[in-house]
């Protein structure tokens, strides 16, 4: 059930993700199998079980996929337990990410794979969300009150998927004027400001150090072209070719 790529076409078309009735009918069984492989990433069974409920809610037909409607919709769901899962549960994030990368390598890994770095914005109405600010929102093409995330994706002739993400926190959030908001959002004490290219560079260095995903190419837009941090990370690596967009000005 992987995307089909038409590599003979120019320009390269967006690959299609083909699904039929059998994929839909057996989806929950496949989701359970997927969920099971992350059991050892949790020290307690309760948060691991709530992960499945959260995933089930995200894949449901609910119009609003916030915690309360999802908890009330899925089997065994409890609103307070689901809220604690999101706000307080502890899991081994690094282990989960490596397991995810192992799955990707097995399903679509290729020596000619491509690592792609870019950011995307999510419009927000209020100011309670971590890192929310009036800033450029690429998803709508203008400045808006939003959160912005930096994303890493993997693509090959066998398919494509996201492989990492991190929330970008604007510099003003680290000023004294935002101290209460940082505390409310439970920012770690050691968290410091990083530019989007710095975040992407750290993602790239970790992916390369883990040696799980095979790749030959690195691609990013002009935001990363102008960053010495990102260029230093991707340049002069034997066997790796990078493609970075050049701004018109």
Give, region by region, the residue ranges found by the protein language model.
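Short, glycine/acidic-rich beta->alpha junctions
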Residues: 62, 96, 144, 222-226
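Phosphate-ester processing/binding pockets and catalytic centers
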Residues: 30-44, 52, 61, 77, ...
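Active-site-proximal, Lys/Arg-enriched surface segment
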Residues: 86-171, 178, 182
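Gly/serine-rich nucleotide phosphate-binding loop at the start of the catalytic core
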Residues: 2-3, 8-14, 20-84
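An internal, acidic/charged active-site-proximal segment
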Residues: 180-249
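Alpha-helix C-cap/termination motif
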Residues: 61, 73, 107-110, 210, ...
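Conserved short loop/turn motifs at secondary-structure junctions
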Residues: 55-56, 88, 218-223
């Amino acid at each position: 059930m992987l995307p089909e790529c038409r590599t003979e076409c120019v320009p390269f078309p967006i690959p299609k993700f083909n699904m039929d009735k059998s994929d839909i009918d057996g989806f929950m069984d496949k989701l359970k199998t997927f969920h099971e492989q992350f059991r050892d990433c949790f020290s307690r069974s309760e948060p691991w079980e709530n992960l499945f409920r959260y995933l089930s809610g995200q894949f449901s037909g609910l119009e609003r996929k916030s915690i309360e409607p999802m908890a009330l919709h899925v089997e065994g769901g409890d609103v307070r337990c689901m809220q604690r899962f999101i706000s307080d549960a502890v899991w081994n994030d690094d282990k989960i990410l490596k397991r995810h990368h192992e799955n990707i390598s097995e399903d679509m890994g290729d020596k000619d794979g491509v690592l792609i770095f870019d950011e995307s914005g999510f419009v927000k109405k209020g100011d309670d969300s971590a890192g929310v600010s009036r800033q450029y929102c690429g998803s709508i093409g203008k400045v808006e009150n939003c959160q912005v995330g930096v994303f890493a994706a993997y693509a090959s002739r066998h398919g494509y998927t996201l492989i990492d993400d991190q929330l970008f926190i604007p510099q003003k959030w680290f000023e004294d004027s935002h101290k209460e908001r940082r505390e409310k959002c439970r920012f770690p004490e050691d968290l410091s400001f990083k530019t989007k290219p710095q975040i992407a560079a750290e993602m790239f260095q970790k992916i390369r150090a883990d040696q799980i995903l095979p790749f030959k190419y690195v691609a990013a837009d002009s935001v990363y072209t102008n960053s010495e941090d990102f260029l230093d990370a991707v340049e002069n690596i034997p066997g790796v070719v990078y493609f970075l967009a050049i701004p018109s000005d």
